Amino acid sequence: GVITGFATILDYPFYIVAQNFKVLCGGISKAQCDKIAKCIDAAEKNATPVIYLLNSQGVQLGEGVTALEGLAKVLMRATQLKGVVPQYAVVNGEVYGSLATLCAIADFTFFTKKSYLAVNSPLVIAAKTGKDVKKEDVGTAQALDKTGLVSFVTEGMEEIREKIAEITEIVSSPMLDAELNDAVPALNNADKLNAAAIAGMLENAVEVNALCAPEAKTYLCRIGGIAAAAVVFDGGENAAELNAGNLAKVREFAEFA
């Protein structure tokens, strides 16, 4: 039901946790949770990032409370790992139930056009509300655009692999010596200065969480060979206004940085 292992992307090492949806629709069991927790412990011990490939309809009914105990263990281990090494969550299909919380703990969450994420499945929500609820209404990247959970929306696994490689290249590569006092004449041209122009001045800039509060752009990048996090406000013709949404986005990004 769940496969754990070790792999490399561009020679960078990663621990992998992958759910097999073909086994009981990815149903979570206590044994699977113990296996995932063991993989997370190994990642912490070896200071190696983790990639979670998630695809689950929830816990196995026959497991009862023991499965919930296992999930609590996994979420606790992942929370303890936060800030130690990067964690990447890939919503590789439909993910419902408490395991969806793992995407909120991870540093980066990847969606595709076939990704759906929700703590309560559409069937559960429909039963509680008495309304016809479709998974497109509650679990897509667009439906979750204000939550800050969707770091990237991609076309498929190959693009996800490339994004993970780009991020790892930024945060893991050794610091390079460079002149930090270089003049940037383009900054004096206020009429043409926008988020895209500023991003072009950064090295290897990768925009994170573009769907949430789009007037506040957040980038991982390098400046003078040093890994950096950049926040650029761009309200278009009008100045961007600070509000709860974009401030929450900036705060979470700053905490990761």
Tell where the protein language model's regions lie, with residue ranges.
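Intrinsically disordered, low-complexity segments enriched in small/flexible residues
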Residues: 1-13, 25, 140, 146, ...
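A generic local secondary-structure boundary/capping motif
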Residues: 4-6, 39-42, 75-79, 99-100, ...
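A structural preference for short, pocket-lining loop segments at secondary-structure junctions
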Residues: 6-20, 35-61, 221-234, 248-257
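Short, well-ordered loop/turn elements at secondary-structure boundaries
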Residues: 9-11, 45-47, 84, 104-106, ...
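Extended active-site and interfacial segments that coordinate phosphate-rich ligands
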Residues: 21, 29-43, 103, 107-108, ...
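Short coil/turn segments at secondary-structure boundaries
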Residues: 23-31, 62-69
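Short acidic loop-to-helix transition motifs that present clustered carboxylates
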Residues: 35, 93-97, 214
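Conserved catalytic cores of soluble enzyme domains
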Residues: 54-174
